[in-house]
């Protein structure tokens, strides 16, 4: 999904900050998703989470870390595109 450069630059900033966080690095599933999000942003696209895996990964990370969530993950939650509703049959 194409997006404006301001949003893409913020996604790149948030993902690089998140990938430097030692607590986040321990969560392999979250690291994989953050890397995918970062690669999409490097190609001037916003990651579209059609399988809805990012939000549950952040939730698991938050629960595992005594409900502490880094600011960069909160901001990434709003930047990642997710389906708004079920699309039905095609």
UniProtKB/Swiss-Prot annotation:
Function recorded in the entry: Imparts immunity to sakacin-A to naturally sensitive host strains.
Protein name: Sakacin-A immunity factor
BP term (GO), one: bacteriocin immunity
The species this protein was found in: Latilactobacillus sakei
UniProtKB keywords: Bacteriocin immunity, Plasmid
Coiled coil: none
Keyword Transmembrane helix: no
